[in-house]
Amino acid sequence: SLDKAVELKSYVAPFTSLVAVLMPNSIEEVLEVYNALKPNAIQLHGFESLEFVKKLRDLKNNGKIDAHIIKVIHIPKDEEIDFKTLLNTAKDYEKYADAILVDT
């Protein structure tokens, strides 16, 4: 829960970067977590659309959030990897994310 995350934040060393790992349903949910925790980075770990990440980038560019945006791209475990598609997806998201994380 968000209340538990706020509590846990008090145990984080001051020199440590705080990353909020989210699978948000809305931009409002991201803002709620950001405003409560003020993380150094927001990791989008779900299947957020390119448009969703663009909206988050716009909020960052407009000074509404001050956190790095990390977008996770999932690789299915039981399927053959199409590296060309994976690379193209990463290139699309890199326009709006500060970092891309590939996860299986």
Where are these regions (language model features)?
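Conserved anion-binding
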Residues: 4, 11-19, 25-104
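Short, conserved glycine- and acidic-residue-centered signature motifs
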Residues: 1
